[in-house]
């Protein structure tokens, strides 16, 4: 009987078992993949920062739009009151003018009828 050889068994030439140099290429691929992952993570961080910044700007814009809406509503109310005020003022002037014309007409009629 022969004693078994100590150490790893020898691989056959067509066996396809990984050798030293392919291990280096797998490390290189792993490093490239890790670099790509790091790049994607950096891009995603930038995108998240942009989204948060956009959200802040949209919130500010929404607040400004609400304030503008409130101002527009107040302006509309004030404009309606002002329109009503000047309409009544115009009516008063028309009534006064009508009364003055009626008085003048009555004076003329009375003056010429006697």
From Swiss-Prot:
Pfam families associated with the record: Synaptobrevin
Q: Which positions are tagged coiled coil?
A: none
| Alphabetical list of Gene3D superfamilies matching this protein | 1.20.5.110
Identify the GO cellular component terms for this protein.
plasma membrane; SNARE complex; synaptic vesicle membrane
Residue ranges annotated for the v-SNARE coiled-coil homology domain, each copy included: 29-89
Residue stretches of biased makeup (Pro residues): 1-11
Name positions with the PTM N-acetylserine. Answer: 2
Q: Tell me, what is an example of a GO biological process annotation in this record?
A: SNARE complex assembly
Q: Which intervals of the chain are annotated as region Disordered?
A: 1-31
Q: Which family does it belong to?
A: Belongs to the synaptobrevin family.
Q: What does this protein do?
A: Involved in the targeting and/or fusion of transport vesicles to their target membrane. Major SNARE protein of synaptic vesicles which mediates fusion of synaptic vesicles to release neurotransmitters. Essential for fast vesicular exocytosis and activity-dependent neurotransmitter release as well as fast endocytosis that mediates rapid reuse of synaptic vesicles.
Task: Tell me what this protein is called.
Answer: Vesicle-associated membrane protein 2
Species the sequence originates in: Xenopus laevis (African clawed frog)
Name of the gene: vamp2
């Amino acid at each position: 009987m022969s004693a078994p050889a100590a150490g790893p068994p020898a691989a056959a030439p067509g066996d396809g078992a990984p050798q030293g140099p392919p291990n280096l290429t797998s490390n290189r691929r792993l490093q490239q993949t890790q670099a790509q992952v790091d790049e994607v993570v950096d891009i995603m961080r930038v995108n998240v920062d942009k989204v948060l910044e956009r959200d802040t700007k949209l919130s500010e814009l929404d607040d400004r739009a609400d304030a503008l809406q409130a101002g527009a509503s107040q302006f509309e109310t004030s404009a309606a009151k002002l329109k009503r005020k000047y309409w009544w003022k115009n009516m008063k002037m028309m009534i006064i003018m009508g009364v003055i014309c009626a008085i003048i007409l009555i004076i003329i009629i009375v003056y010429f009828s006697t």
